[in-house]
Amino acid sequence: TINKIIYERRLYIMIRKVPVPTAGVMLGLAALGNLLAPYSMILKYACGISSAFLGVLLFSKIILHPQMMKNDLNGNSIFASVFATFFMAIMQLCTYTFPFAPIASEVVWYGAICSHFMLMAWFTYRYIINFELRDVFPTYFIAYVGIVVASVTAPTFNHHNLGEYIFWFGFTMYMILFALVTIRYCSKHAIAEPAKPLFCIYTAPMSLSLAGYLACVADKSLIMIVIMQILAQGLFVAVLTQMPKLLKLKFYPSYAAFTFPFVITAIALRQTVSYLNEINIAVPSILNCVVGVETILAT
């Protein structure tokens, strides 16, 4: 009995220490499983189970330490925007469970989408209405553009139209936020060391938008796909040039930014190559090599 009490106390303390950016790793693992699925279903479900485990830890913190979670989200725009990855990860995980529990998975998927929009509305009220440029970070992309994960996963539930509407909403928000975040990074405001790894998020929104576009938009534009892919790869290269400096920093929870952005970049490129093959456009073999390299980097 004493051992049980000690164990429960340790578990309680461990859950208390789970940081909000854990949701980012949760999302990265869920997406990585889908990236690795063509190579190994075992790896896919290993990633899915690991992601779900992190989700249980974070959900437990929400239930057991609601005031701490409230303080984290109310007091820090980075944590508040990063928390959206929790709902993005749930959308991804619903594609794992759909073959086994289709109705429940679809209900949870809808719930995650609604929760993300609710978080978006609250974030706008809490941080955007009276925002200051120095408080703007790439995590803002997560709050507003991250909803496009619904577009990426929509085909699983045969909701292409809904996915297309959400894509256009998220892509419009991306165009606005890209200018805002870029202005912030070009401004004189210094970036604190713990927030520097967040720069990696820069590579995610364009690739996520492209993946959502390819998944749901019925009348696709080849020109738009090519332009989006070129921009996505350009942003990815820009992030890679900063990696040597970022990896020299001591560990921060913001290292979670190294996960999903790399995965979605590889996924978007692979989907682009697949689409070009479908419409009988010759794809340079070098692109397949790049997909392989980006998959390795994401892993």
Per-region residue spans from a language model:
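Membrane-water interface regions at transmembrane-helix termini and the short interhelical loops
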Residues: N34-M41, C94-E106, F123-N130, V152-L162
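Generic multipass alpha-helical transmembrane bundles of integral membrane proteins
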Residues: G111, Y140-M243
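Structural signature of hydrophobic alpha-helical transmembrane segments
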Residues: L43-V56, P102-F117, N161-I176, I223-Q233, ...
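N-terminal signal-anchor module of multipass membrane proteins
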Residues: R9-S60
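Juxtamembrane helix-loop boundaries in multi-pass membrane proteins
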Residues: R9-A31, P66-Q92, W109, Y125-V152, ...
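Membrane-water interface of transmembrane alpha-helices
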Residues: L54-H65, A112-F123, Y174-V181, V237-L240
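C-terminal transmembrane-bundle signature of multipass membrane proteins
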Residues: G28-N34, A52-K61, V181-R184, L208-T299
